[in-house]
């Protein structure tokens, strides 16, 4: 953990090596209950974004509170597709080594750009991702953020529906109930998801985020038990009931040099996304100096790196090239330990689904600029049913979670992590040429290239 934290602190603090701290106004980011006026940057106000810890203010959340909540925001069911990302380029155990390095590198870049958003919000005196974009880049392009928010949330709902479809059919099978994947999906959607998504107040669902991180940690423990216990190796207790026999070959660490490793990169772009919440975490942090904010980021993304590295390694080392897009599908339905993981994941995804769906629905309304006074219950209900039906139909047709994760990451994941934060930061620099502005240009360019190539590779096998 200490090594991961130090790596991320270096990534975050490299921004402090290029120039001196520029003081900014006290309480540039206010408590979430206080609206800060959105003002266009004047020509003399746009400059270097504050890097230091001169400011104090913010909310009441301590660093440990923020770290725990940010870890919950980052780590989700998407980690269950990462072993398939390794299998996309390698089939030998040594492929895990470059995969772990890639996980760490993507974590560091994601942490850095998460911090950039906080810095831009502080400089532009804004409290949200979209407001920061409007002030730094311009309102004329605000539809880009609205569309990206909608698509990002919708891809999340699509992935969750696919996870529930696979998880429920396996859970039903484990208790002797025969049902198809589509039947399971329609059942859980109509009986559980639709009523939850129609709820007007989602506050009661907040505790499910805790279930999510506990479920992921339990799943990691269960995967470790099965790998080190050899239950799915040759002659293993549960091998006969596995989705497919483990498959290993000779494509190891060197295979990471192939373009197919970008599929894992794109999945990781999606896996680390919590960037829309960066302004909220900065605003709610007690004594919210940038140095304290960086500590929150370093510990949180460091923990996410360790969890992702462990679960990716355990899944791939157990099943190799046979790793499914949802790694839980590989395990036998007769394996009680993994059935408990499926239950934990199903509860977590079910509780989180309407929270994410609210972002999808609001994103559509924002994209089409529907006035608040027109957002009545009738429109709310019709839109909910329509969007949920479309999502369910797509989830019924699509069966490869890894494909959805890689395409979503290649398109909007790379944009949200690599491109948008760096563009906002560069706009506040007004043409300055420093090490950091050059670094941001490189990161943005990498996002474009990786997104284009990653999308092509992910789709070519369809």
Q: Residues of each region from the PLM?
A:
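The first (N-terminal) embedded transmembrane alpha-helix
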Residues: 63-81, 190, 269-274, 311, ...
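N-terminal chloroplast transit peptides
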Residues: 1-29
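Central hydrophobic cores of alpha-helical transmembrane segments in multi-pass inner-membrane proteins
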Residues: 77, 107-116, 189-198, 420-421
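Short, hydrophobic transmembrane alpha-helix segments
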Residues: 82-97, 202-203, 403, 460
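Membrane-interfacial loop- and helix-cap regions that link adjacent transmembrane helices
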Residues: 43-59, 64, 115, 120-146, ...
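Residue-level signal for short hydrophobic patches within transmembrane helices
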Residues: 63-71, 75, 97, 101, ...
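Extracellular loop-to-transmembrane helix junctions
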Residues: 85-126, 164
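Membrane-interface "cap" regions at the ends of multi-pass membrane proteins
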Residues: 29-85, 89, 110-111, 115
């Amino acid at each position: 953990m200490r090594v991961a934290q130090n790596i991320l602190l270096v990534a975050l603090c490299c921004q402090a090596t290029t120039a001196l701290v520029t003081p900014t106004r006290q309480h540039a980011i206010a408590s979430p209950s206080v609206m800060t006026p959105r003002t266009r940057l004047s020509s003399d106000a746009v400059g270097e974004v504050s890097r230091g810890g001169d400011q104090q203010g913010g909310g009441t959340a301590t660093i440990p509170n923020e770290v725990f909540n940010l870890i919950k925001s980052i780590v989700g069911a998407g980690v269950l597709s990462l072993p398939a990302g390794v299998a996309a380029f390698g089939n030998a155990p040594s492929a895990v080594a470059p995969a772990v390095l890639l996980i760490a590198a993507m974590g560091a870049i994601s942490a850095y750009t998460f911090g950039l958003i906080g810095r831009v919000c502080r400089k532009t005196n804004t409290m949200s991702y979209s407001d920061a974009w409007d002030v730094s880049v311009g309102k004329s392009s605000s539809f880009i953020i609205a569309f990206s928010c909608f698509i990002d949330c919708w891809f999340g709902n699509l992935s969750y529906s696919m996870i529930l479809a696979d998880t429920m059919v396996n859970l039903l099978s484990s208790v002797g109930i025969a049902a198809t994947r589509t039947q399971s999906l329609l059942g859980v959607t109509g009986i559980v998801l639709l009523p939850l998504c129609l709820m007007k107040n989602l506050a009661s669902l907040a505790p499910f985020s805790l279930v999510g991180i506990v479920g992921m940690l339990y799943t990691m423990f269960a995967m470790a038990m099965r790998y080190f216990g050899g239950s799915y190796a040759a002659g293993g207790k549960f091998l006969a009931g596995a989705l497919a026999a483990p498959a290993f070959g000779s494509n190891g660490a060197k295979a990471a040099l192939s373009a197919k490793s970008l599929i894992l990169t794109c999945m990781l772009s999606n896996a680390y996304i919590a960037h829309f919440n960066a302004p909220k975490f900065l605003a709610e942090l007690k004594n919210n100096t940038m140095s304290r904010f960086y500590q929150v980021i370093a510990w949180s993304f460091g923990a996410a790196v360790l969890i992702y590295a462990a679960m990716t390694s355990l899944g791939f080392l157990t099943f190799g090239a046979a790793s499914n897009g949802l790694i839980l599908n590989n395990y036998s339905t007769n394996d009680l330990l993994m059935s408990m993981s499926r239950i934990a994941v199903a509860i977590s995804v079910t509780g989180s689904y309407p929270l994410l769906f609210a972002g999808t629905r609001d994103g559509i309304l924002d994209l089409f600029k529907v006035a608040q006074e027109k957002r009545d219950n009738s429109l709310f209900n019709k839109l909910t049913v329509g969007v949920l039906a479309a999502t369910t139909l797509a989830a019924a047709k699509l069966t490869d979670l890894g494909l959805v994760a890689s395409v979503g990451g290649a398109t909007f994941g790379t944009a949200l992590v690599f491109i948008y934060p760096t563009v906002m930061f560069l706009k506040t620099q007004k043409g300055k040429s420093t090490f950091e502005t050059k670094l941001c240009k490189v990161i943005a360019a990498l996002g474009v290239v990786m997104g284009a190539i990653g999308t092509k590779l992910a789709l070519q096998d369809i």
